[in-house]
A protein has these predicted regions:
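Conserved hydrolase catalytic core segment
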Residues: 38-81
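Flexible "cap/lid" loop of the alpha/beta hydrolase fold
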Residues: 66-114, 118-123
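Hydrophobic, aromatic-rich cap/lid helix
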Residues: 125-187, 203
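Conserved loop-alpha-helix segment in the C-terminal half of the alpha/beta-hydrolase fold
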Residues: 190-236
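Catalytic histidine-centered segment of alpha/beta-hydrolase-like enzymes
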Residues: 234-246
Length: 264
């Protein structure tokens, strides 16, 4: 088993010029061909699923493909502006890069994340001040650890796993739409010929029409129509399935007959 840090994450190259699906996909293909040296079962979560789809559609390096809640269609072109990722992480990354007061992106993101807008006006200011101060104390004491904040939901803290080594310029690539290198997601999916499994997290739409998920049901149907070899498993949880439902996640990978179409 190989765990690969894509550019802009972990210990990988932090070069903003490489933050696009072509450069990252080709890097993964090179790694498989020159290090693993045989076709692999490739799993990609979120934007990693877009990269994995590129690998599967542009090489014979992938024998089995697992797409964990990948944001097909919803994060590209004008539609991206109506997704939670755009108004949250991508916009916060953009704002962080255009200011010089705060140097700690983890703390900046916690303080500016979109979720604060879901709190009532009566409680938001007090809670924001108190919890941001708590986050700042934790960051000062444990700068190399994943953020922990008392009373903050576990699912909400999942986003901070590995954020210490996250380059906000990666999020900026989704803000500007440059990540996709002008490759339509339809073209990525049409080229996939290997057995494929899509792991779908819960779909939620906000009262304002904002997509509070990585893709909606219509997007999912489009994925399944474009990839005849794709099967589907749903999970009643948020975006980070492998963190929120680890046992069910592993069970799905170990027991499901990937490639056998399952009715929605």
């Amino acid at each position: 088993m190989y765990a690969v840090d894509c550019y802009g994450h972990g210990g990988s190259l932090h070069d903003a010029l490489k933050y696009n699906v072509v450069d990252m996909g080709n890097a993964v293909i090179y790694f498989i061909q020159n290090v693993v040296k045989e076709p692999v079962c490739l799993l990609g979560h979120s934007s990693g699923g877009l990269i994995a789809a590129y690998v599967a559609s542009h090489s014979d390096s992938c024998s089995t493909l697992v797409l964990e809640d990948a944001p097909f269609f919803s994060c590209q072109d004008e539609r991206r502006k109506h997704s939670f990722n755009y108004v949250d992480l991508s916009t916060v990354c953009h704002a962080f890069l255009n200011q010089n007061e705060e140097t700690d992106f983890v703390l900046y993101y916690f303080s500016h994340q979109r979720i604060w807008e879901l709190f009532s006006e009566k409680s938001k200011e007090k809670l924001h001040s108190k919890l941001t101060a708590s986050a700042a104390r934790y960051r000062k004491k444990h700068p190399d650890k994943n953020l922990r904040v008392p009373f903050w939901p576990k699912a909400g803290l999942a986003a901070y796993q590995g954020m210490n080594h996250y380059d906000p310029r990666f999020g900026e690539a989704f803000y500007t739409d440059s990540f996709h290198a002008e490759i339509a997601h339809e073209d990525l999916l049409r080229g996939i010929r290997c057995k494929t499994l899509f792991l779908k997290a819960r779909t939620e739409i906000g009262q304002d029409g904002l997509l509070m998920a990585t893709l909606d049901e219509e997007d999912l149907r489009h994925v399944l129509n474009l990839v005849p070899t794709c099967s589907l498993i749903r999970f009643d949880c948020g975006h980070a399935i492998h963190i929120e439902k680890p046992k069910a996640f592993v069970s799905a990978l170990c027991t499901y007959d990937i490639g056998q179409r399952k009715e929605m």
